[in-house]
Amino acid sequence: MTDPWIKRDGLWFDAPKLVSPPPFLVGHWTAGEGGSDRVHRVLVQRGLSVHFVGESSGSMVQMADLDRRCAHAGSRGNVGIGVEMVSAGLPPKPPKASTRSKVATTCHGRDMTALAFTPAQEAAFVALAEALASRFGWPRQVPDTDRVLTPGEISRWRGALEHLHLTARKIDAGMLLCGALVRAGWKPVSPR
């Protein structure tokens, strides 16, 4: 059997087709402040890919076709549209500093401090999520919880979620992207 994943320009553009339509958007943070060029290099080095990268400026860079499966969230999440938002995510340790404001949030039932996305990033993410929801017929909903969803909950989910909802090993995007969508009118819904 031949490998269906073919590397082109460093990303897996000829990946298998997604289920039609993709069931959800998966929000991530990059864990670094570099732009889409740096994100591209890191993804290639790690054998990963995403559909979009959200720059600090608010620009959204499309990295893969929407009908292709990208390797961004393990087997459960890779059926969704992956969106990496440029941010270190967590405040740097001294003596380093960040120009981003800090925000209190929770992840997997624990309090944490994360770095806020820029207002332009939040606006771009919301606009992209709205466009994807319209295109794929998703309800405008996010999980009302910061816990890992069960496999059954993931298989039934439609709308947006974050990487932290798919595995206990990840904390991105700290419920910040779900929060931005709720402020824009999306509904927090129980995944049960």
Protein language model regions, located:
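Peptidoglycan-targeting cell-wall enzymes and recognition modules
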Residues: 42-121
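Feature marks short, surface-exposed loop/turn motifs that line or immediately flank catalytic pockets
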Residues: 33, 89-91, 168
